[in-house]
Amino acid sequence: MTHPTELPLSPLSALQFYATAPYPCSYLDGRIARSQVATPSHLINSDIYTELVKAGFRRSGVFTYRPYCDGCRACVPVRVPVRAFTPSRTQRRMWKRHRALVATVSPLHYDEEHYALYMRYQSARHAGGGMDRDSRDQYEQFLLQSRINSRLVEFRDLDASGGEPGKLRMVSMIDILGDGLSSVYTFFEPDDAHTSYGTYNILWQIEQARSLGLPYVYLGYWIRESPKMAYKANFHPLEGLLDGRWKTLDPARVDLPPVDAALARAPLPGGHSGAG
C-alpha cells in the first residue's frame, strides 16, 4: 500500500491506497483495467472525499477508486466550471422541453418504484452487462450506501390533478462536495425516446450548484473512445485533470498519451483475456 505522491499529505495522510488486480474494462472492449482504491472507507468523510474527487477519484457505494491502468490513460476526470458554463442551443432546447418536471431532493433511501425503473433502464440500455440482473441488495449497495453528504433526486411529471404524484421519469444520485456537486449515477425511463434526460439532469445539477454557490459539477470520467461517455464533451467549457492539474479541455484537441496496446490488452491472471 502506498500514498500517491501527487496527493496532498493532509487531510489524506490517514488513508492508504492499493491497486486492484486486473479486470476487464467496462468502458472499452478488449481492454484490461485496474483501479487504485482509497481505504479505510470509514475515514472518508465529505471533506476528505472532496479532496479525493479533486485528485480524480470517484465512488461506487462506499468503494472509492480511480483508474490505475497499465499502459492506458483514456479515462480523464472532468468537471464543469459553473460560472463560465454556457449552454448550447440544443441544451437550451432540452432545458425548455423538460422544465415542467418536478424535482424532489431527499436523503438516500430505497423505493420500490425507483428499483423497478432502474431494472428497466439496465435491461434496455445495458442488457447482458450484469447490472441488468442486480438484486435489490446489489442496487442498495451500489447507489444507496454512502458515508458522505449524498442526495437522491427524483424527477416526475407535473400532476395537474393535484392528487397522486406524476409519472416517475428519472432518478439521480449526487454527492455534495466542498467545492461542487458530483454526479454519481442517473437512470431514467428507457421507453421515452429521444428525451435527452441525461443532458437535462446535468443542466439541472449545474443550476443547483449555481444556486448553492458551488463552483463545479464533477461528471466523472470522459473517455474519448467510448460512445457512452461522449455526451460529457458537449458541456462547455469543460475542465479535465491532466498530469495532476485541472485544465480547460478541448475534447477534439486534447493530447492524451497513446495507449500501450500490449499492456492494455494483457491477459488476466489464469490466462483469460479482457475481451468480451
From Swiss-Prot:
Primary localization: cytoplasm
Keywords: Acyltransferase, Cytoplasm, Transferase
EC number: 2.3.2.29
Cell compartment(s), UniProt: Cytoplasm
GO CC terms: cytoplasm
TM segment ranges: none
GO MF annotation terms: arginyl-tRNA--protein transferase activity; leucyl-tRNA--protein transferase activity
Biological process terms in GO annotation: ubiquitin-dependent protein catabolic process via the N-end rule pathway
Catalytic activities: N-terminal L-glutamyl-[protein] + L-leucyl-tRNA(Leu) = N-terminal L-leucyl-L-glutamyl-[protein] + tRNA(Leu) + H(+); N-terminal L-aspartyl-[protein] + L-leucyl-tRNA(Leu) = N-terminal L-leucyl-L-aspartyl-[protein] + tRNA(Leu) + H(+)
Domain of life per record: Bacteria
KW Thylakoid (keyword) present: no
Family: Belongs to the R-transferase family. Bpt subfamily.
Known role: Functions in the N-end rule pathway of protein degradation where it conjugates Leu from its aminoacyl-tRNA to the N-termini of proteins containing an N-terminal aspartate or glutamate.
Protein name: Aspartate/glutamate leucyltransferase
Record organism: Burkholderia vietnamiensis (strain G4 / LMG 22486)
Gene name per UniProt: bpt
